[in-house]
Design a protein with these regions (language model features):
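GST-like domain detector, emphasizing the conserved glutathione-binding G-site
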Residues: 1-63
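Hydrophobic core segments within long, regular secondary-structure runs in both alpha-
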Residues: 2, 59-70, 115-118
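Short amphipathic alpha-helical segments and their helix-coil junctions
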Residues: 9-11, 63-78
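Structural signal for well-ordered, non-membrane alpha-helices
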Residues: 30, 34, 66-71, 122
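GST superfamily/GST-like fold recognition
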Residues: 32, 36-41, 79-110, 115, ...
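Terminal-tail/helix-coil boundary detector
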Residues: 127-142
């Protein structure tokens, strides 16, 4: 859906050589961030103490993913877009998972570039508006 909307409206996805980079990071979110963080939430947040092996496994993999993201954000303002530093659909797909960092027992201070990026995206009015929906308001954790 993100790809379709970005292409249809010509926003949040590069049309130059950085397009492939954006799509690679989007696919990384779908193949790594989402599945692993989902499992981390299951074992660490919703069912703690039920499987020590699973808790340790997904905490370890979660931290590896944070390191990869932090290394990328050491070099660029946003996840993709190269040196232009544009906010893209890759950021949109990854950020909500990072917003739940407490559920997978991650301290964003341990990943300073991720934390900087997290706050940058949090400051966007559209992001705040999306999280403050009537009758389903959830605080964005900082």
């Amino acid at each position: 859906i993100l790809m379709y909307l970005a292409d249809k409206f010509g926003k949040f996805i590069p049309s130059d050589e950085n397009r492939v980079d954006t799509l690679q990071w989007l696919m990384w979110q779908m193949s790594s961030v989402g599945p692993v963080f989902g499992q981390a939430h299951h074992f660490l947040y919703y069912n703690p103490g039920k499987s020590e092996y699973s808790e340790l496994r997904f905490k370890k993999i979660t931290n590896k993913i944070y390191k990869i993201l932090n290394n990328q954000l050491d070099k660029y303002k946003f996840v993709s877009g190269g040196k232009k530093g544009n906010y893209t659909i890759a950021d949109m797909a990854i950020w909500p998972w990072i917003a739940r960092h407490k559920r997978h027992q991650v301290n964003l201070n341990d990943y300073p570039s991720v934390y900087r990026w997290y706050k940058e995206i949090y400051s966007r009015p559209a992001v705040q508006k999306g999280y403050h929906v009537p009758h389903f308001e959830e605080e964005i954790p900082l």
